[in-house]
Swiss-Prot record:
This is Heat shock protein hsp-16.2. GO terms for cellular component: cytoplasm; nucleus. GO terms for molecular function: unfolded protein binding. The gene is hsp-16.2. Coiled coil: none annotated. It comes from Caenorhabditis elegans. It comes from the Eukaryota.
Length: 145
């Protein structure tokens, strides 16, 4: 690593300053980013069901919303905290396109006491193949009169 840029401030680049400032911000916000809900989510997609499990322990049940529009599942959480000394707001949003073989009419959710949100839907039964017999058309011959 060269110390040339640090001791010659007149020749420092604007982009170098920007990169230094961005790296500083990244280090300062790293603890906040580590607690995001995205790190504690799990998606299960097997032959029997589709399920998503989220850790939403930082949110109250009334702070959560789950919507289903067609096959698009939206999960949102928003919490506001106002005190005499300040204001804090936490939020998250997940949008998931459910697989085509999921029974969207049977989507159900459950929130455990320890803040684990589970959303599950069974898979549709596969349409069984069947053999289709071939019917032969009978053509009547017209006799010449």
């Amino acid at each position: 690593m060269s110390l040339y840029h640090y001791f010659r401030p007149a020749q420092r680049s604007v982009f170098g300053d920007l990169m230094r400032d961005m790296a500083l911000m990244e280090r300062q916000f790293a603890p906040v980013c580590r607690i995001s809900p995205s790190e504690s989510s799990e998606i299960v997609n097997n032959d029997q069901k589709f399920a998503i499990n989220l850790n939403v322990s930082q949110f109250k049940p009334e702070d959560l919303k789950i919507n289903l529009d067609g096959r698009t599942l939206s999960i949102q959480g928003e919490q506001e905290l106002k005190t005499d000394h300040g204001y804090s707001k936490k939020s998250f949003s997940r949008v998931i396109l459910l697989p085509e073989d999921v029974d969207v009419g049977a989507v159900a959710s459950n929130l455990s006491e320890d803040g684990k949100l589970s959303i599950e839907a069974p898979k549709k039964e596969a349409v069984q193949g069947r053999s289709i017999p071939i019917q032969q058309a009978i053509v009547e011959e017209k006799s010449a009169e």
